[in-house]
Structure formats: structure tokens, C-alpha cells
UniProtKB/Swiss-Prot annotation:
Substrate binds at S300, T301, T302, G303, R304, K305, R306. This is Adenylosuccinate synthetase. Pathway: Purine metabolism; AMP biosynthesis via de novo pathway; AMP from IMP: step 1/2. It is found in: Cytoplasm. The lineage of its organism: Bacteria, Pseudomonadati, Pseudomonadota, Gammaproteobacteria, Enterobacterales. SUPFAM superfamilies: P-loop containing nucleoside triphosphate hydrolases. The gene is purA. It comes from Buchnera aphidicola subsp. Acyrthosiphon pisum (strain Tuc7). GO terms for molecular function: adenylosuccinate synthase activity; GTP binding; magnesium ion binding.
């Protein structure tokens, strides 16, 4: 029996991980966020109500589940409290079942101002960040100057350290970026009231998880972003500032690899990307319009239109290897309904040398042309279908081809936005390792 399951994105984020986490967590005891911050955007549709979570684990919509924001996550206490209050409007109360690692770095106003100032300075070369301070917060962590959640428990020490960090940031903001300074006193004034609201949630979450594992509890590890936004394995420098691949689970929670039983890779039936960076299968035609309209392809965090393209199996296969995936979940299959033909990119070709490239260096991407296989589409609606056998033959053929190319099984298929629009090909809790 698989007790501990990792759910991560195989593309550039926005794969639909939140819904999958929500569906699987109903049978679990814990759900854990292990990297990223409130730059993530997990959209859930429950009883026709849309709920968007940026920081709190998606599985907390189930009232029997305990949520963990682990040490690999950078936390804005203001955004956290905002989400807690938003959930309360849906009669979901998490105060007594959400725990935050005392080691999680804080995101504060100076991180946001630095993020904005840098993007402005870069101009047309900007990376397209969310402007929420994620990168600068991770920089502080690596430079060993970060304020962490645990620091909120000592107001005197917090005040002293905060003033030093603000002085450090203001020197750069004013002198180099010609940006407005931040006010240490205002940051402290705004921060202090948040402490009482989250004080009891601050814990040694690694110990909580170790105890849960020893007690044979089921744990879902919820990834944010996608594999090709990973700081090490993504399309650098157009990446996020954390490890969104499998390594982020281990370092971001303190749970060792032997305790991970099954790794589920979530991929859309096509491809999308928000912001700048390489995207070999990108479309600019009527199919792009079809994906955007039918798939509602606008970022849940930024509101930006997502770039769309055909499924990139070259990238997907690389993600399978990097993450040691056990199986796949294909989402938004219903968005392909009504297309005359469907394509899968199976290789990259350098347009100058005609050489087949496995995975390009950053300077090579601009010379890459996708090589496609083409398959017939289908007219029958797949929206809401719950059994594999009920899918159109062409849709099943498409799924089979993805399995052949990636050499791992497709265990889950999402056929619509609601939590009930899903096909469980296999029960991943009971697949033998």
C-alpha cells in the first residue's frame, strides 16, 4: 500500500495539481506544501464554487485533513491570514489543523519592492516574475540573512534583525534601483498583529511528519509550479527560485526519499506557460484561441493570459526521468474535444544544423523546431466522463500513445474542472511499489 504520495507538475506549472490533490486528500491524513510561496495558484471547483489557494495546501478543503506548510516554503504572513479568512467565508476553518514550519523564511514588503524594482530595471529583458517577492526571499535564505517564521516568537530579536535587513535593502533600492525606500517601523507595525493570529500554528513540522510516518498515516506532498520552472532543471533563467522537482520534497520537508511511496506527475493534455521563456510548441493560431477559451487559460495568480501549445513529449519524458515518476495524471482532456487533429511533439530539431536535440542549452532554444506526430481528434464530449471505457476511441488512443512515449502508466485522467470530473484508471494508493 502506498501511504505517502508526491504530486508535482511536469510542465511549466498550471497543470491542475490543486484539483488532483483535493481528490486524493480525502483519503489521507496530511497534506504538505514543500516549496514556493504565494506565487502558486491552485484552483478548485467545489459544488460550482471556485476557490483559489496560493499558499495553504489544497487538501485542507477536507475537514479531516491536517495541513503542513513546511520549511521549503517562503511565507507571507499577510497572505496566509488573508487565505485563512477567505476559507472561513466558505465555512472551512483551519486554525487548529494547519501548522507552519518555524524554519520557513518570511516574505515581507522589502522583498516585494526589490522584486518590482528589478523587473522594472530589466525592462524588455525582465524575467516575468509575479512581483510577489519570492525570489528575494529565497535569496535571503541562501545568504543566511532571512527572517524566519520562528523569529516571530521573539519580538525584541525580531525588531533588531528587521531593522538591519531593511537598511540592507534600502541601500540597494535607493542607490542602485532609484526606487522608494521601505520604512522599518511601518513593516514592524503591520507585522506584529499577525503574530497572535498564527502563533499556535508555528511548529517543528519535520518532527510532526516523522511522527505521522511512524504512525502509518497517509501523507500527500503537494508541489507548486512545474518541473521546467525548477531553479536547477528548468529553462534557466526563466524559472522560479525553488526546486519544484522531486528534490524539493526532501529538502523542503525533512522527509527522506525512502518514505516516498509513489510520485505522480501531473500534465495537461496540451501545454501552457505563463510569462517569458522557451516554449517550443507554442501556437499563435485558431488552436491557441481554442485552448485559451475552452481551457480558461489565464493565470490564477497573475491573471495573465497563458501561452498555449501542443503537448511537448520531449519535455515530459525529461520530467519523468528527473522526478522518477511512478505514473501520470492527464488533466484537461476535455479541452481537446472538437479538434479535428491533435499533435504531440516527439523531438526537437535545430533549424540551422538539422540536428535532433535532446534538450537544448538556453542559447539554443531560439533555433529549435518541434517535430510532431499527428493523430485524429474527436467530436464526442469527454467532459465529466468517469470511466476510461466511455472515452472516445481517439481519446483513448491519445492516452495510450502518451504511455508508450513516456513508458509509464497514465493512472488518473481529469475530464473537467469539478472535483468529480475524474477517471481513476488505477487506485494509486494500492499499486505495488
Amino acid at each position: 500500500m502506498n501511504k505517502n504520495i508526491v504530486i508535482l507538475g511536469t510542465q511549466w506549472g498550471d497543470e491542475g495539481k490543486g484539483k488532483v490533490v483535493d481528490c486524493l486528500t480525502k483519503d489521507s491524513s496530511y497534506v504538505v506544501r514543500y516549496q514556493g510561496g504565494h506565487n502558486a495558484g491552485h484552483t478548485l471547483v467545489v459544488n460550482d464554487k471556485k476557490i483559489i489557494l496560493h499558499l495553504i495546501p489544497s487538501g485542507l478543503l477536507h475537514k479531516n485533513v491536517i495541513g503542513i506548510i513546511a520549511n521549503g516554503v517562503v511565507v507571507s504572513p499577510f497572505e496566509l491570514i488573508k487565505e485563512i479568512k477567505m476559507l472561513e467565508t466558505h465555512n472551512i476553518f483551519v486554525h487548529k489543523r494547519l501548522f507552519i514550519s518555524n524554519s520557513s523564511p518570511l516574505i515581507l514588503q522589502y522583498h516585494i519592492e526589490m522584486d518590482i524594482a528589478r523587473e522594472k530595471k530589466l525592462g524588455i529583458s525582465a524575467l516575468g516574475t509575479t512581483g510577489r517577492g519570492i525570489g528575494p526571499a529565497y535569496e535571503d535564505k541562501i545568504a543566511r540573512r532571512a527572517l524566519r517564521i520562528g523569529d516571530l516568537k521573539n519580538e525584541k530579536t525580531l525588531s533588531i534583525r528587521l531593522e538591519k535587513i531593511v537598511n540592507y535593502y534600502n541601500h540597494q533600492l535607493v542607490s542602485f534601483y532609484k526606487h522608494k525606500p521601505v520604512d522599518y517601523k511601518i513593516i514592524l507595525r503591520d507585522l506584529l498583529p499577525t503574530i497572535d493570529l498564527i502563533y499556535d500554528m508555528i511548529k517543528d513540522t519535520t518532527s510532526i511528519l516523522h511522527t505521522a510516518i511512524q504512525s502509518n498515516k497517509k501523507i500527500i506532498f503537494e508541489g507548486a509550479q512545474g518541473s521546467f520552472l525548477d531553479i536547477d532543471h528548468g529553462t534557466y533563467p526563466y524559472v522560479t527560485s525553488s526546486n519544484s522537482t522531486i528534490g524539493g520534497v526532501i529538502t523542503g520537508t525533512g522527509v527522506g526519499s525512502k518514505s516516498l511511496d509513489y510520485i505522480l506527475g501531473v500534465t495537461k493534455a496540451y501545454s501552457t506557460r505563463v510569462g517569458y521563456g522557451p516554449f517550443p510548441t507554442e501556437l499563435f493560431d485558431d488552436v491557441d484561441k481554442h485552448f485559451s477559451k475552452k481551457g480558461h487559460e489565464f493565470g490564477s495568480t497573475t491573471g495573465r493570459k497563458r501561452r498555449t501549445g501542443w503537448l511537448d513529449a520531449v519535455a515530459l519524458c525529461r520530467s519523468v526521468r528527473i522526478n522518477s515518476l511512478s505514473g501520470l495524471c492527464i488533466t484537461k482532456l476535455d479541452v481537446l474535444d472538437g479538434l479535428y487533429e491533435i499533435k504531440i511533439c516527439t523531438a526537437y530539431k535545430n533549424i540551422n544544423t538539422l540536428e535532433i536535440i535532446s534538450f537544448p542549452d538556453i542559447d539554443e532554444w531560439k533555433n529549435i523546431e518541434p517535430i510532431y506526430e499527428t493523430y485524429p481528434g474527436w467530436n464526442k464530449k469527454t467532459l465529466g466522463i468517469k470511466k476510461l471505457i466511455d472515452l472516445p476511441y481517439e481519446a483513448r488512443n491519445y492516452i495510450n500513445r502518451i504511455e508508450e512515449i513516456t513508458q509509464i502508466p497514465v493512472d488518473i485522467i481529469s475530464t473537467g474542472p469539478d472535483r468529480s470530473d475524474i477517471i481513476f484508471v488505477r487506485d494509486i494508493f494500492f499499486i505495488k511499489k
